């Protein structure tokens, strides 16, 4: 099975708290195995771990990583690195190649990223060459390169499960073990 | 041509500033004609209008609308209304129907939405029945129902244009008129 991990660069505690949380939720929902946070923010870790506890699956969050070390390890393990921004090669021209990759690190920055990321990445990918939401970039990229239907993925071990409904909210509390 | 407008509910100035800006950027990038903001926040309007001025196109932002009035007007004009949340019918089961619709309002809330939106919407759509980023929900929905390749859309009248590049940033400043 394809492995995808997300690396979040340039996160500033407080200012980027909600955007980074949305990046993490999006990556989890679309099948990433975890998120590496290249900043120190235990609040992000807690809020995403709380989601995993209640909604299931095995998504992990690693706080305060060295991005260079993580990229080096990933590449040494045979992985590829794809950096999403508004400046790279447009996603439609690379999606087929990314889709073939079975071990992919997706890197997204906040407003500023360390310039060396453009060299460290195997691919610099633009998700449209327009002002950019990193949440949307992760969403569109992962949706387009997913195996099967990512929106039907199940998350084992959930305390809560939503039953799709035409009107209103239908949530099941699963019995504990 | 298909018309799509985005309606943003439940925006709280300050707390939701960046998420709502990302919702607007995403809607613009993927071809919405504008965003209706059902809260009063002129800062959002300014920052998105600034993007439009520099990066082109005709995306508009309407501040402090009445959501009920806007939905009523839209429906009277023959439009349909699709509310994205984590509770509705899963997107893969509705995307074909949404794609056929040539005048679509996409509604996204923040943490809380007025309950009547579930009744006012023609469709309540879940983008995966998992904890939810409204930015990702807009991105995936608009990408899946787009006509043609939304990431190759051009934005006329831009001061700045990005040239896709394998490494680094390549931005052209267009000559004024």
From Swiss-Prot, chains A, B:
Predominant subcellular localization, coarse grouping: cytoplasm
Pfam families referenced in this protein's UniProt entry, alphabetically: Trm56
GO molecular function: tRNA (cytidine(56)-2'-O)-methyltransferase activity
Keyword terms, alphabetized: Cytoplasm, Methyltransferase, S-adenosyl-L-methionine, Transferase, tRNA processing
A Gene Ontology cellular-component term: cytoplasm
CDD domains xref list: aTrm56-like
Compartments, as annotated in UniProt: Cytoplasm
Catalysis: reaction(s): cytidine(56) in tRNA + S-adenosyl-L-methionine = 2'-O-methylcytidine(56) in tRNA + S-adenosyl-L-homocysteine + H(+)
First-tier enzyme category under EC: transferase
Domain of life according to the entry: Archaea
Cytoplasm listed as a keyword: yes
Catalytic activity, EC: 2.1.1.206
A biological process from GO: tRNA nucleoside ribose methylation
Binding sites annotated in the UniProt record for S-adenosyl-L-methionine: 84, 109-113
Complex and partners: Homodimer.
Record family assignment: Belongs to the aTrm56 family.
HAMAP family according to UniProt: tRNA_methyltr_aTrm56
Function according to Swiss-Prot or TrEMBL: Specifically catalyzes the AdoMet-dependent 2'-O-ribose methylation of cytidine at position 56 in tRNAs.
Protein name as catalogued: tRNA (cytidine(56)-2'-O)-methyltransferase
Organism encoding this protein: Methanosarcina mazei (strain ATCC BAA-159 / DSM 3647 / Goe1 / Go1 / JCM 11833 / OCM 88)
């Amino acid at each position: 099975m394809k492995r995808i991990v997300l690396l979040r660069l340039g996160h500033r505690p407080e200012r980027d708290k909600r955007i980074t949380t949305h990046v993490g939720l999006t990556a989890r929902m679309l099948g990433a195995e975890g998120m590496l946070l290249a900043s120190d923010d235990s609040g992000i870790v807690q809020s995403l771990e709380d989601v995993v506890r209640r909604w299931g699956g095995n998504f992990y969050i690693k706080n305060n990583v060295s991005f260079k070390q993580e990229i080096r390890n990933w590449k040494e393990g045979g992985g590829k690195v794809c950096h999403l921004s508004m400046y790279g090669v447009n996603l439609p021209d690379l999606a087929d190649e990314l889709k073939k990759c079975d071990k992919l690190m997706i890197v997204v920055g906040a407003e500023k990223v360390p310039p060396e990321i453009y060299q460290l990445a195997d691919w610099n990918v633009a998700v449209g060459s327009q002002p950019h939401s990193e949440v949307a970039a992760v969403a569109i990229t992962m949706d387009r390169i997913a195996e099967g239907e990512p929106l039907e993925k199940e998350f084992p071990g959930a305390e809560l499960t939503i039953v799709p409904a035409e009107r209103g909210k239908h949530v099941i509390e699963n019995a504990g073990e």
